[in-house]
Amino acid sequence: MRNMSPNRNFHDPIRVGVIGIGNMGQHHARVLSLLKDAELIGVSDVSIERGRDTASKHRVLFFEDYHDLLPLVDAVCIAVPTRLHYDVGTTCLKAGVHVLIEKPIAATIEEAEFLVKTASDHNRILQVGHIERFNPAFQELSKVLKHETILAIEADRMSPYSQRANDVSVVFDLMIHDIDIILELVASPIVRVSAHGNRVSPESEYLDYVTATIGFENGVIATLTSSKVTHRKKRKITAHCTNSLTESDFLNNEILIYRQTTANWTTDYGQVLYRQDGFIEKVHTSNIEPLHAELEHFVNCVRDTQQPSVGGDQALKTLRLASLIEQTALDGQVWRSCDLDLREIAIAGSY
């Protein structure tokens, strides 16, 4: 499955290139240059100055045209604007190169479907950069919730205004992370979706603030709120369960579990010292950088011929739900399973 020349050994480092050296692409180059099982071959960007600076920093090659990079690598990380994902992604896959592409997988559902098909037709790995899956806080949260009965989940993802990612709405920039997470955690067909949104400026093309409610067949209710204009950065998921309340802070890598117990009194010769109403558990999490874990996983999948934990099929389902949420926020319509087969949009059990 690997795109290897006859003279290369299976145990040689995976040769990787980075296409698109904006903010995220520079981080990809940085991490890849540190991975022991990867060899950063080169970078490509429309900005010659930026591309050459990054290449010089990591002592690799710079390519004005990314097509010239493809014969030299086994895999690429694509961090170009979303509108270019389809063209660049399909070109790389057809060239026999494995692909990690930043989220969202594509600008439209049709383009995403073709990317998934192209990867399958050419027997190439297609991983999508839903980086929160590799956040230590999420990985520990998923372990905790496997032993709980979830009633409702709240996901809050807020950021101050920035010039970054202004070519998409807050749904595709920020909320899409939590959509992917919720689908993974709940693992049940969707039966209802409602959403509302707002813009900083009425003339703005894209929504800056969106809140959505998703009803699942198993009874779980998920409420997602994302903002690009909040004066405080926030990345939190709260799970209301029958036996606990779990709060996870993805920014500070912290998980707290609150449990109510039968009230106990501690006494000293008949004198009440204190009353115990409940207790808080703090879950241990590692300090590994999520991007490091994500790229290491990608390299291992290429080396070992394994499908990634966040492949094209999963990312396509996430994109479908994100598109429906944005549409619902724009027109105010509530979607139910009787109106649209939401079961086909995201059945997390197939993740």
Q: Where are the predicted features?
A:
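Hydrophobic residues in well-ordered beta-strands that form the structural core
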Residues: E64, I78, I101, L126-V128, ...
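N-terminal Rossmann-like dinucleotide-binding module
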Residues: M1-H58, I182
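C-terminal helix-rich "cap/oligomerization" subdomain common to oxidoreductases
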Residues: M1-F10, A75-C77, R124, H297-Y351
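NAD(P)-dinucleotide binding in Rossmann-like oxidoreductases
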Residues: V220-A293, G311, D339, E344, ...
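A contiguous active-site-proximal alpha/beta segment in oxidoreductase catalytic domains
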Residues: A106-A165
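Rossmann-like dinucleotide-binding domain that binds NAD(P)(H)
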Residues: S162-I221, S226-R232, T238
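Beta-loop-alpha module in the N-terminal Rossmann-like domain of NAD(P)-dependent dehydrogenases
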Residues: H28, H58-V116
